[in-house]
Each structure stands twice: as C-alpha cells, then as structure tokens.
Amino acid sequence: MSKILITGAHGQLGTELCHLLDEKEIAYDAFGSKELDITNQGQVKAKFAGLKPAVIFHCAAYTAFDKAEDEAKELNWQVNEDGTKNVAEAAQSIGATMVYISTDYVFDGTNEDEYQVDAPTNPKNEYGKAKLAGEEAVKSIVDQYYIIRTSWVFGEYGKNFVYTMLRLAKTHDHLTVVDYQVGRPTW
C-alpha cells in the first residue's frame, strides 16, 4: 500500500509529481478527475479510507482563471473550495498530512516586493477567491498541512507559458505579450 496519494494526477503539476516519484522509485496512488471526483465527498472519503495514505498532494484544481469569472464560476468554486474541503476532511479523518497547492492569485498584486508567507491576502478575481477559500478550509480542518502558493507553473508536461512562447517563436517573427504581469516561474 502506498503512503502517498495525488489528486489532479493528469494535470500539469500532478503529472510532473508522478514522474518525479517514478524517477525516485517512490510508490504512490494517483488519480485524475475521472478516477476521483473531488467534488463528491463520499467518493473522496471512501477512496482515502481504503488507501490510508500518510501524505496527500492535492494538485487537483480548476485553473482557467479567466473562465472562472463568468462561464465557469460555479465549477471554479465547486472544485477549488468544495473539492478542497472534501479532500481536507478525508485527510483529517485518516490522520494524513495534506499538501495543498494554491496560487499567488490569493494576493492583489499591488506589493512591489516579494510576498512573505504571512502577507495579507486580497484576491481580486474569482479564481483567487476560491483558492483562498480552499486554503481556509485546509487550515480549519487539517491538523498537519502545508500550503504552497505557486505562480507561473511550467514543466516538461502540459500546457504552459514557457513552452507556448518557445513554440510561437518558431513560427512568428514578432511576439506580443502582456507587460503588466510580474511573476516567478515555478518548475
């Protein structure tokens, strides 16, 4: 039986984590949204109770932050708040440590310096608000947890800004990108 469980295993971060654990020959159980619907509380509790992992990497998320404002607003909240709450409750019920992957969108972006771990949050969009609600659920439910706030995630697998720019540079003489965003790429 594996001591590690990964949600969101088919997303960019989950895929990277699975490959890293494979390279290190560390056993794990990994589930994408088709194998584990985190918005289904009963399914999550049953899966965790059956497997009893010691550590849960909660990588599952709704990440289309532009669509989270309107057409997918409800789905954003179902996955990022309700789903995270379900994972947190199931983790706590088996005494597992939870690692929650959050985002820099929990901040308003007005800080000119780096954000410190205890910096005040002030999300400006629905995605950031839902991810912050997920953080609050983890903090209030799970005894042993880590919250990791990432930005500009990229890696070998999945769609990401770095690979998009490399691909476009091969086919375009001139690229235009926004110049008002500041972030720290996360590999």
Language-model features, listed with the residues they occupy:
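NAD(P)-cofactor binding segment of oxidoreductase domains
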Residues: 70-99
